[in-house]
Amino acid sequence: MGDTTVPSKEKQTNWKIAVLFFFLGWIFIYADRMILNPVQTLIRSEFALTNAEVGLISSIFFFTYTFLQVPSGILGDKFGKAKVIAFGFAVFGLFTGLTGIAGTFGILLMARAMMGIGQGFYYGPQYGLSSELIPTKYRTLGSAIINSGQAFGITLGLVASSYIAFDLEGGWRMPFYVFAIPTVLIGLGILLFVKEPKHDNTTMSEAEKPKFMDLLKNRNLVLTYLLVFCSLYGFFVMCTWLPVYLEEVRGIARSDTGFISSLVAWTSIPAALLYGYISDKIGKRRPVILCLLPLAACSIMLLLMTESKTLMITALVCYGFFGKLATDPLAIALIADNTPRNQLSTAFGIFNFVGMSSAIVAPYATGLLRDLTGSWNSGFYVSVGLLLLGIVTVLCIKEKKQVS
């Protein structure tokens, strides 16, 4: 869909600077999320929680995060994306630090809920702004670079949390204190150094102006929304429960679970860049996604079926190479390819709202299935089934070759 607005002549940020700051933003978005996971057993012990209640800590975060997606996208389009992003960073940076002082399970849930609200202001405005600034011929590659910050953040959060809590004997609270201040500073940097282009809608008639419901009537957008739900479900099963799975099922030492879990993130970085380059080169996203989803499902099955530690690690590496983090830039490009520029923030808000709905369900459902069945495998099998559904969804997308 073409651009329906007129950019002003005001000087805008070089797209490479924007990519750098948004990359850093994702590092701390995910680091602040992931510092919880290696210390879940300590929290479970201190507050005498069930596995379902531990899963609720993540689910409440993602509930408020998901609730903010569409409103934050609309606010970004209306008042300025960089301003909305900076406000969100201030909120979730503050409550990252306050999570560490929680004295009861209820206060811990409240702090995580506020972290979710703060982080909820990032996704739609960020990808809306980056999609405006990055040239079409670099759109998937640029998104892949930005998105790779998620992998760095996952690694940083998992490894640093394990190291601070267990190796340095800082306990589960200290990692939250450590990450709070740099989080706020990144938001300030985005506000100061990333300037967005201005658009003039005054020359358009009311009939010509795009409407919110147009985004829900677009076939390709709706199918991409469903795709991201299927992809993210398995990813958040991995993010939330993989360290516990490695410790309880595989007998991995607590101090090592963070590093092994981070292999998923590390291998996704070169993969996402490679797929982004290929997609931009051929001008299509759909064929690449169709290759990746079956391989991601097979990776999870290998993780569950093998008794070998070597093959287990191989399965995690393969999931990183073919899974959510590797396919995300392709789905992001699909959204940008099918959305008017002055609705990008809103479109990405809907996209992430649908995707993150899976993150509300996955942590709690997987913990509940473990409590009911006595096995962690049941939750992972659900992830595989949704990936297969995602393949069917992508087959229904109609895509034209993108021209630079």
Feature annotation, model-predicted:
Residues 67-106:
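Conserved MFS/SLC helix-loop-helix module at the cytosolic interface between two early adjacent transmembrane helices
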Residues 285-334:
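C-terminal transmembrane helical hairpin of 12-TM major facilitator-type secondary transporters
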Residues 78-89, 281-293:
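Cytoplasmic membrane-interface "Motif A"-like loop-to-helix N-cap segments
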Residues 3-12, 197-224:
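Juxtamembrane intracellular "pre-TM" segments in multi-pass secondary transporters
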Residues 48, 80, 101-107, 169, ...:
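Helix-breaking motifs and short loop linkers at transmembrane-helix boundaries and internal kinks
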Residues 36-37, 219-273, 332:
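Extracytoplasmic gate region of multi-pass secondary transporters
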Residues 146-192:
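Helix-loop-helix hairpin linking two adjacent transmembrane segments in secondary transporters
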